[in-house]
């Protein structure tokens, strides 16, 4: 592996905001960022074109995973895009676009080996197929939003499956365009909320 440090963060955002980032869907989430400067080994400063009130939320997800600079420089962007390396407790062992990704436990993970030996994520976009796979035991879990609310009863009524609801740190929010259009008027935004 290589260090997860400020240089890696800068490299990640230089890449995301540069030519390679233009090829993917995540760049649009970070258009407020002008550039990133390294302060020390574990600190960076983000310089913005304009305020972005949800930037911290975006940095916690939305494709802001920090990438390994040396690995990408050695193998190239195209290779990395189908053979990714990260900081998690699993390693990608196989990836078939629009089908599945297979992961195996990384015994030398800095946080210790995970409790599972392997995990396979299958990309099933058709709800009835996902439910059939769940009820037959070919998949262990199906996550929202794959399953419409109307199918919950059939899952609960099946002897091999159950619906489990868990609290999550999800935040529902309205984001207004404050630059143009009707929501540029503060009174309109206040009336809505």
Q: At which residue positions do the language-model features occur?
A:
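Extracellular/periplasmic solute-recognition and catalytic clefts
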Residues: 35-36, 93-104, 120-180, 187
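Short, solvent-exposed secondary-structure boundary motifs
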Residues: 21-30, 78-86, 153-157
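Gly/Pro-rich hinge or "lid" segments in bacterial periplasmic/extracellular proteins
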Residues: 57-114, 118
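Surface-exposed binding/hinge segments that line
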Residues: 3-4, 10, 25-70
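Alpha-helical secondary-structure segments
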Residues: 4-12, 41-47, 88-89, 116-118, ...
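Stable alpha-helical elements in mature extracytoplasmic
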Residues: 5-13, 29, 55, 106, ...
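Sec-exported extracytoplasmic/periplasmic mature domains
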Residues: 14-22, 51-53, 60, 64, ...
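Solvent-exposed coil/turn segments that connect beta secondary-structure elements
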Residues: 9, 14, 41-42, 49-53, ...
């Amino acid at each position: 592996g290589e260090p997860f440090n400020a240089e890696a963060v800068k490299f990640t955002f230089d890449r995301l905001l540069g030519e390679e980032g233009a090829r993917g869907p995540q760049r649009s989430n970070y258009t407020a960022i002008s550039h990133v400067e390294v302060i020390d080994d574990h600190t960076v400063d983000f310089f913005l074109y304009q305020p972005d009130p949800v930037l911290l939320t975006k940095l916690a997800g939305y494709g802001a995973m920090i990438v390994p600079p040396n690995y990408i420089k050695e193998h190239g962007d195209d290779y990395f895009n189908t053979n990714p390396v990260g900081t998690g407790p699993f390693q990608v062992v196989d990836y078939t676009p629009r089908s599945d990704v297979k992961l195996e436990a990384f015994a030398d993970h800095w946080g210790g080996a995970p409790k599972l030996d392997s995990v396979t994520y299958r990309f099933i976009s058709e709800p009835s197929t996902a439910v059939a796979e769940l009820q037959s035991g070919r998949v262990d879990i199906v996550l929202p939003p794959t399953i419409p609310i109307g199918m919950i009863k059939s899952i609960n009524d099946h002897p091999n499956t159950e619906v489990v609801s868990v609290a999550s740190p999800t935040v529902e929010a309205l984001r207004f365009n404050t630059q143009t259009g009707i929501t540029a008027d503060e009174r309109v935004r206040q009336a809505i909320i």
